Each structure stands twice: as C-alpha cells, then as structure tokens.
Curated annotation (Swiss-Prot):
It comes from the Bacteria. The gene is nuoI2. It comes from Mycolicibacterium paratuberculosis (strain ATCC BAA-968 / K-10). The keyword Iron applies. NDH-1 shuttles electrons from NADH, via FMN and iron-sulfur (Fe-S) centers, to quinones in the respiratory chain. The immediate electron acceptor for the enzyme in this species is believed to be menaquinone. Couples the redox reaction to proton translocation (for every two electrons transferred, four hydrogen ions are translocated across the cytoplasmic membrane), and thus conserves the redox energy in a proton gradient. This is NADH-quinone oxidoreductase subunit I 2.
C-alpha cells in the first residue's frame, strides 16, 4: 500500500496540471515581452551627429570567451572620418554561431559603442548569414544624423564627444559660450 501512495505522490504534479486550463502562446503573431536587460542582438551605436562610437580598440574581441568577435581597426583621416578619435573599426564581425550572449563584450567597451538589444529573432537557414558584419550591426541613422565619413562637429574635440557635448547640430550652446568643459 505504501508503494501505491508513493506512486500517486510522485504523479501529483502531473495529475494537478492535467485539469488546469491550457495557455496558448501566440508567439509569431504576438511576441511576448522580454526583460529590459535581456541580452539579444548586438548593436554598434553612433554619436548624435552620426559618427560611429567604435574606435577599433578590439577590447570586445579580447573579452569574448567564445572568440565570436573579430575587429580590425584602421586610422581616421580628416578627409575620411568615421569616428571622432584617431581610429575606427574598419571591419567588425560577430559570429552568432559562437556567441553565448554573456555580455562581457559590452562591459569591456570603453566608449559604450557596443550594446545588446532586445531583438532575439536571429534564426536563419544559412550559416553564413549568422555572421553579422558591421553594416548589419550599426545603429540606423536618425533623420538629423549625417552618414559618415564626415568631419567632426566644428570646434569639437574627442573629449566633447565622449562627454556627450556634441549634438546633431554641433556643440551644445553652453560649450560655445565658453563654459569650462
């Protein structure tokens, strides 16, 4: 008799859930909410004037435990400027076949160029399409942004960009008036 009661107790969860109302997830038509800090697809961010935040330092690639990131830096010139600093990430690739979504690359980035979005739909039937190049990772240009390459905002320094003093229309008014930086 004790063995029978043990078997009934073992199936207690099963029996309890058999008589509950079923919940249907309508996933493809109505995606559910994700947590605000969900680690989804990566995004390379831009400054308000359109220049890229990535300086090609390769710290994200060094921090990646899965070796999923490849960065090749190049030097900026005054004629062809992609970021406000001396360098920019000429080649940037993330291999989502290897990425484990840990976010260590985001923590390692000194300019906050790399963030993770809430986009989780990255499935594909072609392995080559899961290696995201820079053009798929860059944040879209907003209407007031200018596509790089273009010169820095007039009178702006690297420090102005990193402190957030540059807007889509140039330096903030307080900075032009001569307030200390």
């Amino acid at each position: 008799m004790a063995k029978f009661l043990d078997a009934v107790a073992g199936f207690g969860v099963t029996f309890a859930s058999m008589f509950k109302k079923h919940v249907t997830e309508e996933y493809p038509e109505k995606p559910g909410p994700v947590a605000p800090r969900y680690h989804g697809r990566h995004q390379l961010n831009r400054y308000p004037d359109g220049l890229e935040k990535c300086i090609g330092c390769e710290l994200c690639a060094w921090a990646c435990p899965a070796d999923a990131i490849y960065v090749e830096g190049a030097d900026n010139t005054e004629e062809l400027r992609y970021s406000p600093g001396e360098r920019y990430g000429r080649v940037y690739q993330i291999n989502y076949l290897r990425c484990i979504g840990c976010g260590l690359c985001v923590e390692a980035c000194p300019t906050r160029a790399l963030t993770m979005t809430n986009d989780y739909e990255m499935a594909d039937d072609n392995r080559a399409d899961l290696i995201y190049e820079k053009d798929r990772l860059l944040a879209p240009l907003l209407p007031e942004m200018t596509a790089p390459p273009h010169p820095r905002a007039p009178g702006a320094t690297d420090k102005d960009y990193y402190l957030g003093n540059v807007t889509a229309h140039g330096l903030r008014e307080a900075q032009r008036a001569g307030e200390p930086r």
